[in-house]
């Protein structure tokens, strides 16, 4: 693989994201790591942890080079207010969004081959006056994508979501034939192009207990899910379901599957996070670029103490590199 540039956003400056990025610099990488962040923030966290860090200037006019141990390439975005580990400040809500916007725009214009995001604090961003539902929705809107799919993955399991951050009472109405067609199409396409799976097999959850029990526990399966699955199978997609979510996550089903499509957030993700928390990666499918993320939050109570585990960030970066290779 020719060296590529990967852009990283550390996320909430008062959280563990900045120090996790500093920990990424403690090894060499086959790609150039361009960090969209405040220089003083990164140096201060490196000093707190007692870790070496040299920040190199980002030069868009120069070809990318593999990142050497102890260094990061800096694309500067200045904090509105100095950050104290563990202490949120609404003054920096706009800073977080600025880093996301610059990183996203760089992916859209071809500067970067992939984007890896650290954890943000949605509450403080909204309190700063910036409407923000999450990374997935932000990148969908900024890239003018018609629709995107949130998927979490470990080495053993991939779970995509038909709906993301919705209250339970809104989910049934949200799962329309048009939505399901689009979600399944994106999932099938990206499993082939970004994951290199020639004929992906997807297990599809029902919405209701026992996948509706033949209409006795809800009719969404009969009215919506089954007709769409039949339609997509006729186009050559390898889909099984709808299957009851309480029995789907068994080896006899998962051993032959490349991904699971859950109907809502808390239907599929508890199983994945129980199995692989700290080793899981959040991936946004359907974007015109590769985006992966850690599977944990800002952990304000750990910030600046050197106790945060960099494992999920490393996994997210390694997966992004694999996806870059698959798309070349």
UniProtKB/Swiss-Prot annotation:
One GO MF term, please?
cobalt ion binding
Sequence positions that bind substrate: 135-136, 273, 282, 291
Catalytic activity, as annotated: 4-(phosphooxy)-L-threonine + NAD(+) = 3-amino-2-oxopropyl phosphate + CO2 + NADH
The residues the record assigns to binding a divalent metal cation are: 165, 210, 265
Q: Which cofactor does it need?
A: Zn(2+); Mg(2+); Co(2+)
One cellular-component annotation, GO: cytoplasm
Could you say which EC number(s) this protein's record lists?
Answer: 1.1.1.262
Q: List the disulfide bonds.
A: none
A Pfam family per the record: PdxA
Record GO biological process = pyridoxal phosphate biosynthetic process; pyridoxine biosynthetic process
Cofactor notes: Binds 1 divalent metal cation per subunit. Can use ions such as Zn(2+), Mg(2+) or Co(2+).
Q: Which pathway is this protein assigned to?
A: Cofactor biosynthesis; pyridoxine 5'-phosphate biosynthesis; pyridoxine 5'-phosphate from D-erythrose 4-phosphate: step 4/5
Q: Which UniProt keywords apply?
A: Cobalt, Cytoplasm, Magnesium, Metal-binding, NAD, NADP, Oxidoreductase, Pyridoxine biosynthesis, Zinc
- Which EC class is the enzyme in? oxidoreductase
Tell where it localizes. Cytoplasm
Purpose of the protein: Catalyzes the NAD(P)-dependent oxidation of 4-(phosphooxy)-L-threonine (HTP) into 2-amino-3-oxo-4-(phosphooxy)butyric acid which spontaneously decarboxylates to form 3-amino-2-oxopropyl phosphate (AHAP).
| Family classification | Belongs to the PdxA family.
Q: What else is known?
A: The active site is located at the dimer interface.
Quote the subunit structure annotation. Answer: Homodimer.
Designated name of the protein: 4-hydroxythreonine-4-phosphate dehydrogenase
Name the gene for this chain: pdxA
